[in-house]
Amino acid sequence: MKKHFLTTLLFLVGFSTLVAQDFSVDANFRTRSEYRHGQGRLFQKEEKPAFFVNQRARLGTSYQNEWLELRLTAQQIFTWGDAQQPQAELKNHLGFFEAWAKMQIDENWNVKLGRQVISYDDERILGGLDWSQYGRFHDAAVISYGDFLNIGLAFNQEGQPNVGNTYNVGSASKNTYKTMQFLRANKKWQDNSLSFLFINNGFQDFDSSGKQDGVSNMQTTGFYGIFPISSLMLEASAYYQFGKFQKTSVLAYQLRAELIYKTQEFTAGLGMEMLSGRDYDDTSAKIKSFNPLYGTAHKFNGHMDFYYLGQNLQGTTGLNDIYAKAIVKFNEKSNLLFMPHIFMSNAKRADNKSYLGTELDFMFTQQFRKDVGLNIGYSHHLPSDAIKTPITHDMQNWFWVQLNIKPTLFTTKQ
């Protein structure tokens, strides 16, 4: 794989000197050291904390002329020390994060084909998940009309069979879809922006013997908007989920609103998000817990990723997240974020305890230069008696340091 990628890269560099309008080679080196003492799950009294360093290494090439744009990005993700020495088989092999071609049909319409990041608006439903070292991509075709309209189509298979089209990569419970279609429209005027999204996901179903048993289609639709109100900015979203998931009817919703006040040196925000859940005594045969699908979950509901990315509340009583944020800007290259959350159950719990806990998130950002940045984060979780057990540790925290280097290695224009 490495040999093939380097051969392709050298070919493109040589080719670019003859015909390219724009050609560039870029890299991304990102390390993150983490101390985990309650990240993603409650830490127990007899457990030992985890510490590790993981790394992302990407090498990308871009080519562009007046009608065609190409992008190839190879990446390898690994944890320091997870391969024995001397060189052995890599646990996480080199693969392509991006491999797409974008063709301009006319001055407005274009089509983008291949492995690509699909990210819109606040990334609540469709996002790049860049916090994850792996990121998130889709193998899809996206037809766009300027910045106004995007239509996406995807059909996934795990190979090239001669018979049948059963899809059994991952599982539906992890939102691995067999088919996806979406339509997103955006309108901007003055300082306002309003987006509409409709997405259909088809999930492969299986019977009790493991044989293919049709496809369940689940739909998600809603709006996202940004609106100025005097000296404030309102950011809001609302989504409704219906259809079927694993042969079960779905009826769920998401609502979020945040007021933001911003100056050159300071940003303050106050918001609330509601993700529907199911009452403990609800006997209806419906899924009522909202599924955030393919968004950047790390941006929402606390940096410790306990409630949704940690899978601790999906399929249960949902979540109400009341939060605030303050960003102090020290200079053009550094700032400090503080973001407290109060978590409550959206639906009724058997113990009648709606308060789930509080999380305090801190993040310092320092940009040393255009292509080198440092992030330092600390989060503290205070779970309530509703989710604690007798063996839950009194201290739930998480500390991390991330260095991100993104240089442009080579560029040529003609």
Label each residue range with its predicted role:
Residues 32-40, 77-85, 116-129, 156-169, ...:
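Sequence/structural signature of outer-membrane beta-barrel proteins
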Residues 394-414:
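Outer-membrane beta-barrel "beta-signal"
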Residues 22-25, 51, 104-111, 129-286, ...:
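Signature for the C-terminal beta-barrel architecture of outer-membrane proteins
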Residues 44-55, 64-107, 118-131, 206-209, ...:
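Surface-exposed loop and membrane-interface regions of Gram-negative outer-membrane beta-barrel proteins
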Residues 283-316:
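Flexible glycine-rich, low-complexity coil/linker segments exposed to the extracellular/periplasmic environment
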Residues 20-40, 68-72, 149, 192-194:
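Transmembrane beta-strand segments of Gram-negative outer membrane beta-barrel proteins
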Residues 318-321, 346-347, 407-411:
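C-terminal functional modules
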Residues 4-14:
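Sec-dependent N-terminal signal peptides
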